[in-house]
Regions:
Chain B
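Glycine-rich phosphate-binding loops of nucleotide-dependent enzymes
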Residues: 1-249
Length: 319, 249
């Protein structure tokens, strides 16, 4: 029978980490607070990707599109429409979810690699529109100096907003992963054929997963706007998709919090190695090679296994 | 309950099922036998929708289900197990069956209730009925082959089928496991009153449990009748049983 106990230790961990993040701006310089916000929202983005990648087994090769769409939607609504500010924050993730639905509708007809390839091409299409449509999206310049609500621009407003929204989003995604839908999704990842045979409409669930992942990526996009007050086409360029894919693999794509960890490692690496050399991708390449050879389950996956949490069977989500 | 008429399916010119005819009445245990490559598994794939037929009809409770998607057919009440173990290997035994139950109860799009609190009793009941209750927390991929085959059946039971299709339920099992599987099939048809359609190479098992037997050869139905009549059918003996075997049995 499944474990029914409430894990007290786990609750303490969550509260401790939460408190740490809350107090962070008190003793860290401004730059590091900004960096933490960046890690949080990138982690949220990576976790949303992992929802379909690690838990759904879908080759989500162009996840950045939903992130970019979320960011651009908010940016455009804030700069070009007279709508109340907060409607933008609600509408942007929904628009991402709709884009997820449309792209998903076309892509889930194919499986595995073909799914990924088609997604890259459709996503690049969205990127090309944004990149070229100067009069509306600002083209390759993007949009800068986006007017944000006052509460977000004072002191550490953006940081706290990012922290709260990320925490809520992570909690919701955690619930989703452990819900009947999440469990079904993992079953589909393991064996789609058998799922069909037990009455599960596989494509419909994959589409639902795509919409959910798009939604949360959209939230991450709005957070980016909150922190940076600008958007540019790189937010939905395929290289970013690759980066967040690596974050999932690096942190452990068969764990829930792995992508968060992966994002932290990547963002920190990029920031600090980037100071010394512009060839930071070279370091990344070496890290990746080491990862593939020595930690195929990612950092968190390996820690769990070493700690005896892993059951020896890859991909049994317990954290 | 199930009626298959003149079913045909070819793969790239190879006629896998040429003319299959089959009838299964409610509560009956029917076996399909035939040499390797006779088209038994393809026939099952056709009935459960994994493969769609070129022509012919499959009536289930009077409704033609030929060409429907597997999940639609499953929802109509036909569930199956596979010849090669086909389970969710990374999940626990419990979760394997629970997912099937969730699918049956249409809960799979529920995103907010914790799954670990759901359907515990129902899942354990099914595991109990097949004798896997003690292993419910094990990762299914780590079970023995025999247990995995039994889990196959347990997953199929999750959808509360009216017709249970078993594709070689004892393939690769040890003699003890086979005896247990036979006991399980007896219980399913006796206690639960399930209609069972299965194919099997173990003739002893077939003749001990099947009420009617359908014999296939080269994709065609030779005969469907009671075990005694099948045994005495000359055509069957020549085609499949190599003569003599059954008269000894």
């Amino acid at each position: 029978m499944p474990d029914q106990k409430i894990d007290v230790q786990k609750i303490f961990w969550v509260m401790g980490i939460g408190l740490l993040f809350l107090l962070l701006p008190r003793f860290l310089p401004r730059f590091y607070v900004y960096l933490t916000a960046l890690i949080l929202l990138t982690g949220l983005l990576a976790t949303s990707l992992n929802l379909v990648l690690g838990f759904g087994g879908m080759y989500q090769f162009h996840h950045a599109v939903f992130y970019g769409v979320g960011a651009y939607s908010l940016a455009l609504m804030l700069t070009k429409s007279g709508l109340p500010v907060w409607t933008g924050f609600i509408a942007a993730p929904l628009i991402s979810a709709i884009v997820g639905y449309i792209i998903g509708l076309i892509c889930v007809r194919l499986s595995k690699l073909y799914f990924g390839m088609l997604q890259i091409s459709l996503g690049s299409l969205v990127w090309a529109i944004v990149f070229r449509w100067y009069s509306f999206t600002g083209g390759d310049d993007g949009i800068h100096g986006i007017p944000l609500p006052k509460i977000l621009s004072v002191s550490h407003g953006a940081y706290y907003f990012t922290l709260i929204i990320t925490a809520i989003s992570l909690y919701l995604m955690f619930r989703i992963v452990h819900s009947p839908f999440g469990r079904t999704f993992q079953a589909i990842r393991d064996n789609p054929e058998r799922c069909e045979a037990i009455g599960i409409h596989v494509r419909r669930h994959q589409l639902a997963g795509e919409v959910i992942a798009g939604f949360f990526a959209g939230i991450a996009g709005t957070l980016f706007v909150t922190v940076e007050a600008s958007v540019f086409p790189d937010l939905m360029f395929w290289t970013l998709s690759l980066e967040i894919l690596i974050m999932c693999l690096l942190g452990g794509w068969f764990t829930f919090f792995g992508p968060m960890l992966g994002a932290a490692i990547m963002v920190i690496l990029r920031t600090f190695v980037g100071i010394y050399t512009e060839y930071w991708t070279l370091i990344l390449g070496i890290v990746l090679m080491l990862l593939i050879f020595f930690m195929p389950d990612g950092v968190l996956g390996m820690i769990q296994k070493a700690g005896g949490r892993g059951d020896g069977v890859k991909g049994n989500h317990r954290l | 309950m199930l009626k298959v008429e003149k079913l045909q399916k070819s793969f790239d010119g190879f006629m896998a099922v040429a003319d299959a005819n089959l009838e299964v009445s409610k509560g009956e245990v029917v076996a399909v036998i035939g040499p390797n490559g006779a088209g038994k598994t393809t026939l099952f794939h056709l009935i459960t929708g994994q493969v769609s037929p070129d022509s012919g009809h499959i009536f289930f409770k009077g409704q033609d289900i030929a060409g429907l998607a597997p999940y639609q057919i499953c929802r109509k009440g036909i569930c199956r197990s596979y010849q090669v173990v086909n389970i969710f290997k990374r999940m626990t035994v419990f979760e394997n069956v629970q997912v099937a139950l969730m699918s049956f109860l249409k809960m799979t799009l529920n995103v907010m209730t914790p799954a670990r609190k759901l359907l515990i009793k129902e899942t354990l009941d099914i595991l109990e009925s097949v004798g896997l209750a003690e292993k419910s927390n094990q990762i299914s991929g780590s079970l023995s082959h025999g247990d995995q085959k039994v889990l196959e059946i347990a997953i199929a039971l999750g959808n509360r089928p009216e017709l249970l299709i078993l594709d070689e339920p004892t393939a690769g099992m040890s003699p003890e496991e086979t005896a247990m599987a036979l006991g399980l099939m007896n219980r399913l048809s006796g206690k639960l009153g399930l209609t069972i359609l299965f194919c099997e190479h173990d003739m002893e098992l077939v003749f001990s449990i099947a009420e009617r037997i359908m014999v296939m050869q080269l994709g065609k139905t030779l005969i469907q009748s009671t075990p005694d009549l099948v045994k005495s059918c000359r055509q069957v003996q020549e085609a499949y049983l190599g003569g003599g075997y059954l008269t000894d049995a």
